[in-house]
């Protein structure tokens, strides 16, 4: 029985590692942090508990003189119509396009800018985990042709775009 459990654990670990390696997590090679700051609307996202049932989601990034970044995520809970805000902080990572974001004490999560429009009009965001993916825009709606290009970029990187939830704006 112990041997069977060990085999199952090894197989599941191999499958998990293989599935994660199929995602291209490379970030953009350059980032003008000041230009990235400001308001971003959430166009689409993978489902996760901390944003479940949220609509009209947006993020506001503010660069402080000391290099820290203030983060304010907001949206409306579709179940009760209540406006919710989550205040956090971010810091730059080791590579362009990498940030570390925290909404609770000193617990930070990856925030990887996977693709970014040349004019900073839209961004594709992921993390080291394949469970997270967002499409952000400076406007509440993206032209369909642009959205389709972003979806193809995500698919080419190994993401399952059929799991994306389109966010009501």
Where do the language-model regions lie?
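Sec-dependent N-terminal signal peptides
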Residues: 4-13
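A beta-rich soluble binding module of mature secreted/lumenal proteins
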Residues: 17-169
């Amino acid at each position: 029985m112990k041997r069977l459990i060990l085999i199952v654990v090894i197989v599941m670990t191999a499958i998990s590692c293989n599935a994660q390696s199929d995602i291209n997590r490379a970030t953009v090679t350059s980032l003008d942090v000041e230009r990235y700051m400001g308001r971003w609307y959430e166009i689409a996202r993978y489902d996760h508990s901390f944003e479940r049932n949220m609509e009209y989601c947006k993020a506001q990034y503010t660069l402080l003189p000391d290099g820290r970044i203030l983060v304010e995520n907001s949206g409306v809970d579709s179940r009760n119509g209540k406006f919710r805000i989550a205040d956090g902080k971010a810091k730059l990572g080791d590579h362009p396009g990498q940030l570390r974001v925290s909404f609770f004490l000193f617990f930070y999560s990856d925030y990887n800018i996977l693709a970014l429009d040349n004019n900073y009009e839209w961004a594709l965001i992921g993390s080291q985990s394949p469970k997270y993916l967002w499409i952000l825009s400076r406007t509440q709606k993206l032209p369909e042709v642009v959205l389709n290009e972003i979806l193809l970029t995500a698919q080419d990187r190994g993401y399952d775009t059929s799991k994306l939830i389109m966010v009501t704006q």
